[in-house]
């Protein structure tokens, strides 16, 4: 029994110590640092809108995509019910999904004869991407302008305001935040 305790005691103590350090202390320190240094992001990048009565309401997160389907709104990437799809690009199921989404876009805006940007007919890897490409936003400008009765120039200006540049000036592509554009479009009514 003594030999058993000599072997297992350090293992159990090590396990408990590592659990405490890796499961409580380290995450706690990182959370405190993130909350202090990156308050907005650490708390979900919540977007709040002021109401006419002076109160505010939370309308969403700048980091999580919302589903917009009305023609007067900028519409984001195809939702995949909050989960990654992981479909093979050559699979029959993926092909059918893309064809279904293309048909939906043609029904939504039958006068638009331009090629539909890829990100409007495919889901993002996360399934909740808040951004679309500049091409996807440009594809929708005429429809939004027509539906809202505003100039295409106004729509383009709002899109430009909510377009982020490439990371470090060269990584990735500029993206447009769908929720922020739609909130700005709604503020035009006020």
Swiss-Prot record:
Function: Part of the high-affinity ATP-driven potassium transport (or Kdp) system, which catalyzes the hydrolysis of ATP coupled with the electrogenic transport of potassium into the cytoplasm. This subunit acts as a catalytic chaperone that increases the ATP-binding affinity of the ATP-hydrolyzing subunit KdpB by the formation of a transient KdpB/KdpC/ATP ternary complex.
GO molecular function, one term: ATP binding
Locations listed in the record: Cell membrane
Keyword tags: ATP-binding, Cell membrane, Ion transport, Membrane, Nucleotide-binding, Potassium, Potassium transport, Transmembrane, Transmembrane helix, Transport
Identification of the protein by name: Potassium-transporting ATPase KdpC subunit
Family to which the UniProt record says this protein belongs: Belongs to the KdpC family.
InterPro entries: KdpC
Transmembrane segments: 13-33
Main localization category: membrane
A GO term from the CC aspect: plasma membrane
Subunit and partners: The system is composed of three essential subunits: KdpA, KdpB and KdpC.
Annotated membrane topology: Single-pass membrane protein
Any Pfam family hit: KdpC
């Amino acid at each position: 029994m003594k030999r058993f305790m000599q072997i297992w005691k350090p293992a159990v103590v090590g396990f408990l110590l590592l659990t405490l350090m890796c499961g409580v202390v380290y995450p706690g320190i990182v959370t405190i640092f993130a909350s202090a240094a990156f308050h907005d992001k650490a708390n979900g990048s919540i977007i709040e809108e002021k109401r006419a009565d002076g109160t505010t309401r939370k309308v969403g997160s700048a980091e999580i995509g919302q589903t917009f389907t009305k023609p007067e709104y900028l519409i984001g990437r195809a939702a995949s019910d909050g989960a990654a799809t992981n479909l093979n690009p050559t699979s029959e199921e993926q092909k059918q999904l893309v064809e279904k989404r293309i048909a939906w876009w043609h029904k939504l805006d039958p006068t638009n004869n331009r090629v539909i940007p890829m990100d409007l007919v495919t889901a993002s890897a996360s399934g909740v991407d808040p951004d679309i490409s500049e091409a996807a936003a440009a594809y929708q400008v005429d429809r939004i302008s027509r539906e809202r009765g505003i100039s295409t120039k106004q729509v383009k200006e709002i899109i430009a305001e909510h377009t982020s540049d490439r990371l470090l000036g060269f990584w990735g592509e500029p993206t447009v935040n769908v929720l922020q554009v739609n909130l700005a479009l709604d503020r035009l009514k006020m």
